[in-house]
Regions:
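Short, solvent-exposed loop/turn segments at secondary-structure junctions
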Residues: 38-40, 57
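Long, compositionally biased intrinsically disordered terminal regions
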Residues: 60-65
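Short Gly/Thr/Asp-enriched flexible loops that form oxyanion-binding sites at enzyme active sites
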Residues: 40-48
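Short, basic/hydrophobic alpha-helical segments
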Residues: 13-29
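Short hydrophobic/aromatic-enriched beta-strand-loop microsegments
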Residues: 51-59
Length: 282
């Protein structure tokens, strides 16, 4: 038997409902069972509730037992319980299209989905518990992986503060440095070209400058200008070193310096990371 309690979007009303569950959720002695329970810990934390007590995460349990397999609930239910769950896409639509939110779905359907979710999670917990014991994984699971969930959840919730002023200054400095490098590369190459185009870089290095007679080509017929290839040819022409320096600064600028400020949460003013304990092992 499972129960579903709708929680309204309005914060004050939601707080009133969650207040009834707070003592149980914050009880340090009661076991909390979940599938990817870190997600649930973070959801209620936003409402001022800090879940406490021992945990049993069915996703992590399965990861320890079979790290090379998938760990989603739908897969686990079909594989170990021989049960086909209601897929969330059946309620809110496929990812390829504009999805609904669960608040857009009739409460009767949401209740059935949520109740099934809880029921399946409990059944999976009962299935995996003896498996962990049989494989000698109890200490790793209960003493390391489960406490780690609280640590990771706290790290994600706390977030990271960025010095946006310093990043902006670094962005300006790197942009200036890239423009200078661009001019130097054109002078060394004896022509202008798109430095960010691997195809054009290959044509300049191997057709125009002819720094390598037997240059390697990709399946598409273009010259390979990977970092590994260019490093081997660094001593053959000064433009190669400049190209490598340009690429390094360009990646630093686009991937970190300019990108990180865009990831700041407007509500907290911080970047909030996400840590995965169940990365598929290959």
């Amino acid at each position: 038997e499972a129960w579903y309690v709708p929680v309204p979007a309005a914060r004050e009303e939601a707080d009133k409902i969650l207040a009834h569950f707070s003592p149980a959720l914050q009880n340090p002695k009661s076991l909390k069972i979940g599938q990817n329970i870190k997600f649930d810990i973070l959801v209620v934390r936003k409402y001022g509730i800090r879940i406490a007590g021992p945990l049993f995460d069915t996703m992590i349990a399965h990861y320890l037992l079979n790290p090379e397999l998938r760990h989603g609930m739908d897969y686990l239910a079909e594989t170990y319980l021989k049960y086909k769950t209601v897929r969330i896409e059946e309620l809110i639509g496929p990812r390829e299209r504009k999805q609904l939110t669960m608040r857009d779905v009739p409460v009767v359907q949401v209740a059935e989905y949520a109740a099934e979710d809880a029921d399946i999670t409990l059944k999976l917990k009962n299935y995996f518990t003896p498996c962990l014991e049989k494989e000698g994984l109890e200490s790793l699971f209960y003493d390391i992986e489960m406490p780690l969930i609280y640590v990771l959840a706290e790290m994600e919730y706390t977030g990271v503060t960025l010095d946006t002023v310093a990043l902006k200054q670094s962005s300006e400095e790197l942009t200036t440095a890239l423009k200078k490098l661009e001019k130097e590369i054109y002078e060394l190459a004896g022509m202008k070209f798109n430095i960010n185009s691997a195809r054009q870089v290959g044509e300049v290095l191997f057709d125009h400058l002819k720094i390598e007679e037997k240059a390697r080509k990709t399946k598409t017929g273009s010259y390979s200008t990977s970092e590994e290839i260019l490093e081997k040819m660094r001593s053959k022409h000064p433009v190669v070193g400049k190209l490598l320096e340009y690429r390094g600064l360009k990646k630093l600028l686009s991937t970190y310096i300019d990108a990180l400020p865009e990831l700041i949460n407007p509500e907290t003013g911080k970047i909030h990371t996400s840590y995965n304990q169940a990365v598929t092992s290959t």
